[in-house]
From Swiss-Prot:
Its cofactor is Fe(2+); Mn(2+). NCBIfam families: PRK03906.1, uxuA. This is Mannonate dehydratase. Its EC number is 4.2.1.8. It catalyses: D-mannonate = 2-dehydro-3-deoxy-D-gluconate + H2O. Catalyzes the dehydration of D-mannonate. It is an enzyme of class 4 (lyase). It comes from Histophilus somni (strain 2336). PANTHER family: MANNONATE DEHYDRATASE. The gene is uxuA.
Length: 394
């Protein structure tokens, strides 16, 4: 697989020199300074591309070209935003960039309650605490109708959690959930956040699927025409939250996705950490079944906790994800493609490393400190080497 690294642009505390020293050859990045919905010009794309090439790196994957909320809700100027998206794809293709990762999650890209969860070894990880999240939804945000999604026992547990919170605790939890994370343009006050949630009133799972289907049928033919492979990222976490629909969470969702728009340009970002949170998801089976549609890979592992809806980011080769089996399935697909004349490697990046060692003293993007990802990339490099020697005689 191609070893890549997510980079948040010139303001990322991890430099391109750091990326090279980590052993990555490809960069996963986006033009975060361009507002959601606006066209990425050839000039801006080439400017970023040149910045990477100066350091001997290539722009392997765009993560992400964000999808405007109007497109997801099919309101406002959604057709204009779709037309802009098509032009951005054409511009990327003209610059030689051919993989675009994106997601179709409403409002929030990914959600955690704790961005500094201390592990037994003293490193820090990202965590989703279901009880804390329920306390936020029920007693801080006070989302109308939220009580319908929790049992009386869950509500009592959340209330007890909320009652022992200080004002500082409430502010921190709120910020963690709604202030947005790296790669996301959004950051909301509680009132603004609720207003965004309200945009999805009346949009059921089935209705939301029709919105995604419309987007796919508009965008994917353009991607196919210009040689871009679209790679949708799964929901994180892979279940409905905050009354919002989620439609890219399971193997059945993946099948619907392929059936809805069967062109080869319509594919997946296989994020093991996102899919792996759901115990029912057999990641090896999913990787094998949709191998020919996997165009980009995020490798990380999560550990489900005593409350099965709570989880934290585990060490990359630990946790609930069968990383051995998944990597073997992906390499099998890579060799199959090679036998059929496609020598392109599947780009892989280590996802969400722990904050550790010297990075504990630094200001870092949550989940995206250097050393934890350096460790993860080195571990995946070793795993891939061993698999190739033992199973593929390479």
């Amino acid at each position: 697989m191609e070893q890549t690294w997510r980079w948040y642009g010139p303001n990322d505390p991890v430099s391109l020199d750091d990326v090279r020293q980590a052993g990555a050859t490809g960069v996963v990045t986006a033009l975060h300074h361009i507002p959601n919905g606006q066209v990425w010009s050839v000039e801006e794309i080439n400017k970023r591309k040149a910045l990477l090439e100066e350091k001997g790196l290539v722009w392997s994957v765009v993560e992400s070209v964000p999808i405007h909320e109007d497109i997801k809700t099919q309101t406002g100027n959604y057709q204009q935003w779709i037309d802009n998206y098509k032009q951005t794809l054409r511009n990327l293709a003209s610059c030689g960039i051919d993989i675009v990762c994106y997601n179709f999650m409403p409002v929030l890209d990914w959600t955690r309650t704790d961005l500094e969860y201390e592990m037994p070894d003293g490193s820090k990880a990202l965590r989703f605490d279901q009880v804390a999240f329920a306390a936020f939804e029920l007693y801080i945000l006070k989302r109308p109708g939220a009580e319908e999604t929790y049992s009386p026992e869950e509500q009592a547990e959340a209330k007890a959690y909320f009652d022992q919170m200080s004002e500082a605790d409430i502010a921190k939890l709120t910020k963690n959930i709604i202030a947005g994370l790296p790669g996301s343009e959004e950051g909301y006050t509680l009132e603004e956040f609720q207003a965004q949630l309200d945009r999805y009133k009346g949009i059921s799972t089935e209705k939301f699927r029709t919105h995604l289907a419309y987007f796919l049928n508009e965008i994917v033919p353009v991607a196919q025409e210009v040689g871009i492979r679209m790679a949708i990222h799964p929901d994180d976490p892979p279940r409905p939250i905050l009354g919002l629909p989620r439609i890219v969470s399971t193997i059945d969702d993946m099948q619907w996705f392929v059936d809805t728009q069967p062109l080869a340009a319509n594919g997946f970002t296989f994020c093991t950490g996102s899919y792996g949170v759901l115990a029912e998801n057999d990641l090896v089976k999913m990787a094998e079944k949709f191998a020919d549609r996997i165009y980009f890979v995020h490798l990380r592992s999560t550990q489900r906790e005593e409350n099965p809806r709570s989880f934290h980011e585990a060490d990359h080769l630990a946790g609930d994800v069968n990383m051995f089996g998944v990597t073997k399935a992906l390499l099998t697909e890579e060799y199959r493609r090679k036998a059929n004349g496609d020598n392109r490697l599947i780009p892989m990046r280590p996802d969400h490393g722990h904050q550790m060692l010297d990075d504990l003293k630094k200001k870092t993007n949550p989940g995206y400190s250097a050393i934890g990802r350096l460790r993860g990339l080195a571990e995946f490099r070793g795993l891939e080497l061993a698999l190739k020697k033992v199973y593929f005689n390479d």
